[in-house]
UniProtKB/Swiss-Prot annotation:
GO terms for cellular component: cytoplasm. Forms a cylinder of 14 subunits composed of two heptameric rings stacked back-to-back. Interacts with the co-chaperonin GroES. GO terms for molecular function: ATP binding; ATP-dependent protein folding chaperone; isomerase activity; unfolded protein binding. GO terms for biological process: protein refolding. The gene is groEL. This is Chaperonin GroEL. PANTHER family: 60 KDA HEAT SHOCK PROTEIN, MITOCHONDRIAL (PTHR45633). It comes from Lactobacillus acidophilus (strain ATCC 700396 / NCK56 / N2 / NCFM). It catalyses: ATP + H2O + a folded polypeptide = ADP + phosphate + an unfolded polypeptide.
Amino acid sequence: MAKDIKFAENARRSLLKGVDKLADTVKTTIGPKGRNVVLEQSYGNPDITNDGVTIAKSIELKDHYENMGAKLVAEAAQKTNDIAGDGTTTATVLTQAIAREGMKNVTAGANPVGIRRGIEKATKAAVDELHKISHKVESKEQIANVAAVSSASKEVGELIADAMEKVGHDGVITIEDSRGINTELSVVEGMQFDRGYLSQYMVTDNDKMEADLDNPYILITDKKISNIQDILPLLQEIVQQGKSLLIIADDVTGEALPTLVLNKIRGTFNVVAVKAPGFGDRRKAQLEDIAALTGGTVITDDLGFELKDTKIDQLGQARRVTVTKDSTTIVDGAGSKDAIKEREDSIRKQIEESTSDFDKKKLQERLAKLTGGVAVIHVGAATETELKERRYRIEDALNSTRAAVDEGYVAGGGTALVDVEKAIKDLKGETSDEQTGINIVLRALSAPVRQIAENAGKDGAVVLNKLESQENEIGYNAATDKWENMVEAGIIDPTKVTRTALQNAASIAALLLTTEAVVADIPEDKPEAPQAGAAGAPGMGM
């Protein structure tokens, strides 16, 4: 396909148009009084959401050059979401602010490479200052506040705090749809291990790139499956029952993997294959743990079992299994309480007898997985559209809370970024262009608070002017229209979310500024379809 190329000013201006179109859509959602965005779906009802990354991913612009600019901003949002789990709208607002100001200066003749150095220098100083003013999460109330701010719901904040209290900060918390209209919490027996699907074609939810299996059978083996004939009789029996299957094996290779994938794509049955967790003897022990939890049997040579002779009653079962690219979560296994308790007692005895700190640590990890359970948040709503929107909010809140536990929290509502701006305002660059880059970041740090104020119906410049004269952590609470200490009021953001949003925004914006050429496809003109009944047109029988 032929290509079209734009250079210098024309290239950057086209990219910036795309940046603005995406950012102007996303930034309307920031803050407690942010608006919703309605997304058209290829089928079914439209989605209503205020989730930044969901909106960013859904935007596809007609102009190729503008679309590239939009996709770069979407990447900043996506990377922030991947690392911190929230802060996507903040990342988008910061990217637009840095890119806009930078483009003005490059157009006026500044050197983009010097500006980039200044942006990087100011970003590093800002991140260092964020860590200095960060607070550690020490109470259930603080966890509830972080989650409440992210989800704009006090009830959700308390629900997530309860979940973390029950399964621990590192515990497994999953989110499921409820059959009723109430959102509730339950704790069930479950386990998570660090192994993801062997093929992305096994996913059942393309938006979240995860596979969800309801009431599946679970084949547990330490063998490598390369010949599909070894498990064919078992598969046929599972298909007849209309059940799904999770395969936990040493590996699935050869003809076996593509055959399973093909049957999944054709809709013959739902199957996901993952590698067994751990290595060597620890792998065997972990497989035995999974077998106890799910009521299955480990198919291994040690017990004289062959794959081709495996029967349905040797498979484990669970109410639900969720597999991502990195992890597998088994919820509510069908194992008997006696078998699980016996396994727990055995591990406790090994911990007492072990003389190795490393072995003790690994045994304690196994025990925690068996005893900790899985907290399940059942999300309820009156309609399907409301359910999706509520689920997005709860997922963001859960990710925010985990981020706060990791790196602490800072004053929310954009206040921390303005506090950082005040602390590093005297930062100096080695050249005038580098100083320009530093000044661009300093101005951009106030963009989130300006937008939050504007979404609340206030003049962003007036709010910012007053905020810059306040002491640290005193900010504008858009939810109550009051000026107060944001930390004491419970308006807090995870440091990790704020840090990641700034770093990704600076990185993408700097790339935009240093772009000198953009290459895009030239759309080909499609030939007009021949009119019906035209002379010489072949008939259907040919």
